């Protein structure tokens, strides 16, 4: 309940009844499920058969210009590496918790920046079909995956950020990927 002015007020009791004749949940067999899946990859960001229309409809969108300009600018900037994490202040910290907090904060600066850069390349590729963006995104994502081996790759959400980025790249680059 909610306490207001020293007394507790309760909401009304809500309920539902399960009748014996209600439909039961019965998932389809695996064979039925598989037979209904589309034969092409069900893209999330842009369906492949609607891609050209998406590109032409986005021609005048300010977001398109922003993504392309940012991608062009980022192409000229070398990728930061996780080993570039600023650890210079670690020696002055007196306990493990403080050192871990500093390392987490400093490594997230690099992870966050490169995650955004790779996402910009993915979106710029979807807006243009320019292979330069595809190649740069893949190069950076493949490098970022290697960061898991670094002692500087610290943080609660680094792996989920990489997983999200890889999922986006898989969706966008599906037709270009090989085994």
Residue ranges and their predicted role:
Residues 3-24:
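Extracellular fibronectin type III
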Residues 17-40, 44:
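Low-complexity, Pro/Ser/Thr- and charge-rich linker/hinge segments at domain boundaries
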């Amino acid at each position: 309940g909610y306490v207001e002015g020293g007394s507790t007020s309760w909401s009304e009791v809500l309920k539902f009844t399960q009748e014996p004749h209600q439909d039961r949940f019965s998932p389809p067999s695996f064979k039925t499920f598989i037979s209904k899946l589309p034969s092409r990859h069900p893209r999330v960001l842009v369906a492949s058969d609607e891609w050209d229309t998406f590109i032409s409809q986005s021609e005048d969108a300010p977001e398109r210009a922003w993504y392309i300009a940012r991608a062009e600018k980022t192409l000229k900037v070398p990728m930061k590496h996780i080993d570039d994490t600023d650890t210079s202040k670690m020696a002055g910290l007196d306990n493990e918790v403080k050192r871990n907090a500093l390392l987490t904060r400093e490594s997230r600066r690099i992870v966050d920046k490169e995650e955004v850069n790779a996402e910009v390349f993915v979106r710029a590729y979807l807006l243009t079909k320019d292979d330069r963006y595809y190649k740069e995104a893949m190069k950076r994502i493949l490098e970022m995956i290697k960061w898991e081996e670094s002692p500087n790759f610290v943080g609660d959400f680094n792996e989920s950020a990489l997983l999200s980025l890889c999922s986006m790249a898989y969706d966008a680059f599906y037709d270009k990927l090989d085994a």
